């Protein structure tokens, strides 16, 4: 399998980034839902948010890499069997997912740094608090973060259902390409 995308399939880097992000986003969603249920006396009360913040910073760095990679190695064009509505919807959904991911990561940063303290990333390095206002910043960003998280999950579920629809009903290569296979790509 090639590193870069071809006209018929995604390369291993794009596929890896896609699935790592899919797993990480759902893991972060689950971690976020779980950590807000913890009581002060729970052993994970302080550890879970620190883990959530560290992974969030890593995801922001990964998202920048992903956007840069998308420009270096553009995705394959939509199959010719896709109509205009399908092509426009796919582009809009991808733009929305990227925008939502950036927004959720920024809102997480605003929650985490509202008290003026940096974010320690697994104890390896700190991300400084550049915008901090302990007043309403954390609460406002928290509400935004929650709504964005649900939006990402809902849109990504629709994204997955669309891929399954293409695979099962339309019987095209949309899903196969993101799995590293394509019947229209003569073995390359």
Task: List each model region and its residues.
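Membrane-embedded alpha-helical bundles that constitute the cytochrome b-like, heme-associated redox core
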Residues: 1-188
